[in-house]
């Protein structure tokens, strides 16, 4: 429908067929579609993983997001192995603060479990983080089954959200070794070292652990 939109302090105050606001600045977009800013809830900016760094940092990635109509990104704060959740969150804030062109938030990666990390979960909630990520592969980030069980149990108590990257790391490593030994190092070998049945096995294992 055709309408005027009154905005103040980044909030929509009113939508009506015709709005009189003499003190307002008028931006004429007649004939255009007016959409709310999109939210990209899965970005990996400035992430060091598998001996490389993702293509975009917070500046270039958020700038591209804005050009496409995305005004909020939710990235994954990833502590280095042995670090606390607080240290991981502080590191990602340093990467984003002053560089990100749009609004941003974080999911928190859990790669281990101990009494300190368990206590930090409450702190993450206090900091506005209620969604978490765990990896069943990638040595620098992966979590073991025992730790994953305890983490899922805690997040269930908190009513949190947990995303899990589901793959069977051990079998993937075995398949990679076989391809290397056969000299099959091309891009085409990548999906063959990560067949779908390994994802299915990991998803099944995750669900059974979560239901324990």
Q: Where do the language-model regions lie?
A:
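Receiver (REC) domain switch-region micro-motif
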Residues: 26, 39, 132
